[in-house]
């Protein structure tokens, strides 16, 4: 390649870049998988919670790519294996976890509503999952991965960034609060974290400014 004057991009052959690519792929497939399962009769409790208790429309559920992880232990794991991914790749994506007796792997999220964590490029970097049966913790997050770092991620900013730049940021407590506010037409919302202020500035880009409104 060098003799032919062709410069190869090293990042395409970098092991870390290739691992990140696999994680993005697995997350994308997982997002679609859980979205589809939300339409299944076994997801009736999740459907009832979202539509009746939280009053979310089909459009909102679809826009935020909300899904459902069933009670089964390894449905997603087996699905991803059939898609051609190996156990280590799936584990590094954070969507499976080791069994307590260390004798294998199970899906990380079970009987939970799934909220994909979307970055500013529109890619899923991780997941937050809400318990439907009282299992603790109430909200379970993806572990830290090569593409997900919880202290630098802002949920919903992919949709609210433009409005925050012009209207200021309105803080809310969690995913459901943000989604409900967004559906109601309040589109400059972001989830409140202690570290949030400087992270918003970084995410919006250098030179951006905005007012902060606390709710």
PLM regions: where:
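Conserved active-site segments centered on acidic
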Residues: 1-45
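Short, surface-exposed acidic
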Residues: 5-13, 54-66, 85-92
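Phosphate-handling DNA/RNA-contact segment within nucleic-acid enzymes
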Residues: 15-22, 26-29, 72-188
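Membrane-proximal amphipathic helices and linker segments at transmembrane-helix boundaries
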Residues: 41, 53-61, 67-77
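Structured alpha-helical
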Residues: 50
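Flexible loop residues that form catalytic
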Residues: 69, 130, 194
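Short alpha-helical
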Residues: 71, 176, 195-199
């Amino acid at each position: 390649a060098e003799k032919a004057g062709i410069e190869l991009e090293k990042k395409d052959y970098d092991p870390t870049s290739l691992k990140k690519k696999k994680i993005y792929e697995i997350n994308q497939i997982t997002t679609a998988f859980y979205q589809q399962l939300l339409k299944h009769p076994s997801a009736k409790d999740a459907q009832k919670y979202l539509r009746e208790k939280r009053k979310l429309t089909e459009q909102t559920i679809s826009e935020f790519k909300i899904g459902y992880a069933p009670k089964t232990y390894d449905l997603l794991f087996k699905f991803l294996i059939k898609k051609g991914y190996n156990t280590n790749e799936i584990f590094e994506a954070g969507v499976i976890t080791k069994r307590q007796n260390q004798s294998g792997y199970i899906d990380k999220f079970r009987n939970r509503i799934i909220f994909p964590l979307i970055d500013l490029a529109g890619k899923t970097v991780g997941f937050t999952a809400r318990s439907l049966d009282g299992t603790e913790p109430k909200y379970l997050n993806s572990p830290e991965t090569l593409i997900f770092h919880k202290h630098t991620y802002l949920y919903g900013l992919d949709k609210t960034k433009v409005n925050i730049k012009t209207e200021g940021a309105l803080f809310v407590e969690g995913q459901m609060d943000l989604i409900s506010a967004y559906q109601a037409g309040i589109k400059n919302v972001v989830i409140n974290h202690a570290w949030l202020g400087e992270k918003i500035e970084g995410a919006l880009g250098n030179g951006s400014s905005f007012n902060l409104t606390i709710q």
